[in-house]
């Protein structure tokens, strides 16, 4: 048995719920990491590992520490990325896995980096004709040109971390501070 926490012998070849042929059986579920969303990742990663085990996969939780360090168990065939925010969604962990030759869930490091960074993703969406609300990218001290109300978001942050809705001019400085 590759990962004893699953409580089943390894070597299953079909997903016991769907009957789909499995390409990999030994799965490292990466969770944690350095971001402000670490605690959410620990919970969601544990749920992913439990669900994979229930479907007959040999899955193990692999905690990525706050310094981005982790060790994959010997025999890992694929990594399931269950990390959020910095290093999880921005292409960081994906680049490390690629360098180690480990297949992983999700997109390439480059695609993750572009999608995570709103200064890169918004223009790509506009160019592709995907509807997006009016926006502007501001650096510290630059004046806003969009009329209130506005939503202020950090350029490189996941989920709703650092997001504010601004309805009055006096709310603007606090929203900018939160986004940085």
Feature annotation, model-predicted:
Residues 1-7, 11-110, 114-127, 139-143:
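ATP-binding N-terminal substructure of ATP-dependent carboxylate-amine bond-forming enzymes
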Residues 21-22, 72, 142-145, 154-158, ...:
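Solvent-exposed alpha-helices and their adjacent loops that cap or buttress functional pockets
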Residues 39, 119, 133, 170-173:
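Residues in well-ordered alpha-helical elements
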Residues 41, 149-178:
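Glycine-rich phosphate-binding loop of ATP-grasp-fold ATP-dependent ligases
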Residues 47, 103, 108-113, 164-180:
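An N-terminal domain-start capping segment
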Residues 127-158:
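Rossmann-like NAD(P)H-binding beta-loop-alpha module
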């Amino acid at each position: 048995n590759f990962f004893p926490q699953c409580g089943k012998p390894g070597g299953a070849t079909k997903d016991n719920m769907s009957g789909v042929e499995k390409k990999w059986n030994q799965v490292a579920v990466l969770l944690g990491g350095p971001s402000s969303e670490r605690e959410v990742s620990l919970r969601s990663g544990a749920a992913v590992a439990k669900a994979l085990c229930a479907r007959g996969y040999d899955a193990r939780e692999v905690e990525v520490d706050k310094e981005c360090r982790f060790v994959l168990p010997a025999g890992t065939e694929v990594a399931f990325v269950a990390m959020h925010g910095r290093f999880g969604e921005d292409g960081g962990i994906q680049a490390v896995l690629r360098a180690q030759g480990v297949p992983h869930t999700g997109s390439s490091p480059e695609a993750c980096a572009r999608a995570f960074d709103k200064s890169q993703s918004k223009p790509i969406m506009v160019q592709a004709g995907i509807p997006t609300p009016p926006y502007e990218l501001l650096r510290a001290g630059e004046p806003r040109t969009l009329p209130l109300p506005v939503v202020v978001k950090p350029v490189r942050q996941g989920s709703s971390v650092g997001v504010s809705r601004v309805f009055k001019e006096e709310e603007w400085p606090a929203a900018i501070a939160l986004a940085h």
